[in-house]
A protein has these predicted regions:
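Sec-dependent N-terminal signal peptides
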Residues: 4-13
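N-terminal signal peptide c-region/cleavage motif recognized by signal peptidases
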Residues: 14-19
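N-terminal small/polar-rich segments of proteins
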Residues: 20-114, 144-183
């Protein structure tokens, strides 16, 4: 009987069920997030090429600089002088988290659709060579801005309206979309 008891004890001691488990450990870390003010842009003024005339024989263009300068070329000419022409760059207000930098982008070209004076559709005109002036950079040519201590910056956008020879009198409109993103 004693031999059976020793064999039974030996069988229990060597059983995998009774074997010691391996060592384990745990660790804890942190999860975190910082929520900041969303960045937004609001249009304040439209890009306005003013009132102009078009030559019957020569194509032309009018360029409005982001800083406000205007240049007529080729067959495009102002319809009148001074404020009557109504030329101005577009202006946008950007707001978000104070002190943050951001990037602004514009399309390469936008298309202005027209309505003929007296009705009907006019041929589309291209607006290209869009330029930027960011108040936070004092007029330097850049697409990276900096929000001030109030979380604001202002952007001016200029561009060039291309006018084919013989363009009929019409009212033109285009949508100018800018995109601002935090850097």
């Amino acid at each position: 009987m004693r031999k059976r008891l020793i064999l039974a004890t030996a069988a229990l001691v060597s059983s995998p069920v009774l074997a010691a488990t391996g060592q384990s450990a745990t660790a804890s870390g942190q999860a975190q997030a910082v929520i900041i003010t969303p960045i937004i842009a609001v249009a304040l003024n439209d890009l306005d090429f003013g009132s102009l005339t078009s030559s019957r024989t020569a194509s032309g263009s009018v360029t409005v600089g982001a800083e406000g300068a205007v240049n007529y070329a080729g067959g495009a000419a102002p319809a009148c002088g001074g404020a009557c022409a109504g030329v101005a760059p577009a202006r946008f207000l950007v707001s978000g988290e104070a002190g943050r930098s951001y990037t602004v982008s514009t399309p390469a070209t936008i298309t202005a659709s027209g309505t003929l004076i007296g009705g009907g559709s006019a041929p589309a005109l291209a607006i290209d060579a869009l330029t930027l002036h960011l108040d936070s950079h004092g007029g330097a040519v850049t697409s990276i801005g900096q929000l001030d201590d109030k979380g604001e910056d202002r952007i001016a956008v200029g561009g060039r309206l291309n006018v084919p020879a013989g363009t009929a009198p019409a009212h033109y409109r285009a949508t100018l979309t800018i995109m601002v993103t935090y850097s």
